[in-house]
Structure formats: C-alpha cells, structure tokens
C-alpha cells in the first residue's frame, strides 16, 4: 500500500468587487459612507461588527473590494447593497447587477421615453 498523504484543507479566499462608478460620478452615491455601512452590517459568526482578520473591506476610488477568508456569499453582498440603497432612498433609481462572476455593478433603471409620452397624450 502506498502511504497516505495528509490532506490539509486549502485556505481559500472569497473576493468580490462592487463597481460604483456611475452613481459616484453623478454625485448621488457616497462610497465612503457605503464602505462604513458594510463594516457595520457584515456578519461574521452571526455577529455584526465582528470582522476581525476574517473579512477585509477596501475602497479604491469608485470600487469596493470585499475579501473574506471564511465562506462569504456574493448574494449576501447584493442583499446588503440593496438594503443600503433602500435606506438612502436610492432603490427607485439604482439596481445591483452582476457584471461577471465576482463583480456587482450599480446601474440606473432603463426608463423608456416613448411609454411616458404616449401615456401623457391620452
């Protein structure tokens, strides 16, 4: 028999990006305030404000990067982003869209001008 090798669990990290470029450039979204919101609201082991060395939240200009050493769901990040938008009354204008596997992006809702004009004529 071949000797068994010790299997060490891989230390994996989860990394997600939030692209806030459009909303920040238009001046309706404060990325610093949102970063602080995430630091206060992200739960680790069922407790908020317990980031420690497990979850790192960084801001580079108009992007926020969340790196976690413990399992962290991309869906949870979307949930917190939507919660922040609702709290600041931005939910009616902005939506959270996945642009790729590790990135969310804030985009404006597309409202067609043709529908508004036809309704006002009636």
Curated annotation (Swiss-Prot):
Pfam families tied to this protein: Ribosomal_L22e
Signal peptide, first to last residue: none
Modification Phosphoserine occurs at: 112, 118, 120
GO terms classed as biological process: cytoplasmic translation
Keyword annotations: Phosphoprotein, Ribonucleoprotein, Ribosomal protein
InterPro entries per record: Ribosomal_eL22, Ribosomal_eL22_sf
Example GO molecular function: structural constituent of ribosome
GO cellular component terms listed in the entry, alphabetical order: ribonucleoprotein complex; ribosome
Protein family: Belongs to the eukaryotic ribosomal protein eL22 family.
Name of the molecule in the record: Ribosomal protein eL22-like
